[in-house]
Amino acid sequence: QRIERLITDYSQMLKDEVALSKEKTKKIDIEPIIKSVVDDFNNIYKVKKGINITYENDGGKKYFINGIENRIEQIIANLLDNAISFSNNNKNITVKVSKLEGKKISIDILDEGQGFKEKDTNKIFRRFYSNRPDKFGQHSGLGLNIVKNLVELHNGTINASNRIDKKGARMEVILPMV
C-alpha cells in the first residue's frame, strides 16, 4: 500500500508541476481564501477531534498577492492537515496573517503538537522525507515538498520552527504583496 501511495503521490506531483508551469497568476486577496479553508477544516475537525482552528490578522484590510487561488488553498490545506496530524485531540491551531516590511505578507500556522526535532526543520521539505510516527499513518513524504514548490511558484519562502511561546510547531509562509 505504501508503494502504491508513493507512486500515486509522485505521479500527481509530476502532473502538478506541468500544470503549474502553464497556470497564470492574478491579483487575489488571500484572506477570504484562507478563511474558507479554515472554516472547512473546522467543520470537520472540531467535531472529529475537538481541534479548534482560529484565524487572526493584524487588522489589515486586504492582503493582495499575485497568485493562483486553488494553489493558495492547497498550501493552507496541506499545512493545516499536517498541524492536525501532529496535534492531540482538543488542541488549538492558529492561522495568523500579517503584513511585513518590504511589501510582504506572513502566514503563520501555529499548532500545539510536539514541535520539531531541531535536525528535522531543514529536512522536512525534502522530497520523500517523513518524520511522522506510525501512529499518524503512512505518508509519502511529498506533502511539504509540494507546499514548498507551490510557495516558491508564488515567489515566496516557507520556514519551519518550534514555537517560542509554548510547545508546538510554527510554519511560516512569506509571500510578496502587490
Predicted regions and their residues:
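Short conserved segments within the C-terminal catalytic ATPase subdomain
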Residues: 44-56
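Short helix-loop "hinge" at the ATP-lid/N-box region of the Bergerat-fold HATPase_c
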Residues: 83-84
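A conserved beta-strand-to-alpha-helix junction within the catalytic ATP-binding
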Residues: 24-42
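Conserved micro-motifs of the catalytic ATP-binding
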Residues: 18-23, 62-67
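Short conserved segment of the HATPase_c
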Residues: 116-128
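Short alpha-helical Gxxx[C/S/T] motif in the catalytic ATP-binding
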Residues: 143, 147
